[in-house]
């Protein structure tokens, strides 16, 4: 299923005349996958990478009975969403959409991180920076 492609040229963040890219990583509960994916589609993000990951934070591990024995499970299955945007406005809009969609109020809801990207290269076309992440076609 393709995400809707939306030009980002109306909302861009520049530093020294160069468009700055911001990467947002969100690690959320597996059961929130569809809600977060839909929230990102609703705000028309330009693209997203989604991965299944394992980890723990304040939630820590838990004990489970496996074949009659107690086993400590240290890592929890999670879903990681990665989105690249080109403005602080889009950064806040994206974080807000993810936070709202992923929220349960319980320990283990996840984390959202954002940081500036130093460089980006589209392998197929050799485009760099903003042009590397701005889709001009559906290929």
Spans of model-derived segments:
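Positively charged, small/polar-rich N-terminal and surface patches that mediate targeting and assembly
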Residues: 4-139
């Amino acid at each position: 299923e393709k995400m809707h492609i939306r030009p980002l040229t109306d909302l861009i963040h520049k530093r020294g005349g160069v468009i700055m890219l911001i990467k947002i990583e969100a690690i959320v509960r597996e059961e929130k996958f569809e809600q977060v994916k839909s929230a990102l589609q609703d705000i028309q993000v330009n693209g997203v990478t989604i991965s299944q990951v394992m980890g723990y934070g304040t939630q820590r591990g838990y004990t489970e009975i496996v074949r009659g024995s107690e086993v400590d499970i240290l890592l929890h299955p999670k879903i990681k969403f990665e989105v690249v945007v080109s403005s602080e406005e889009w950064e806040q809009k994206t974080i807000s959409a993810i936070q709202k969609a992923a929220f349960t109020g319980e320990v283990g809801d996840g984390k959202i991180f954002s940081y500036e990207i130093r460089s980006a290269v589209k392998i197929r076309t050799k485009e760099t920076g903003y042009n590397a992440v701005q889709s001009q076609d559906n290929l």
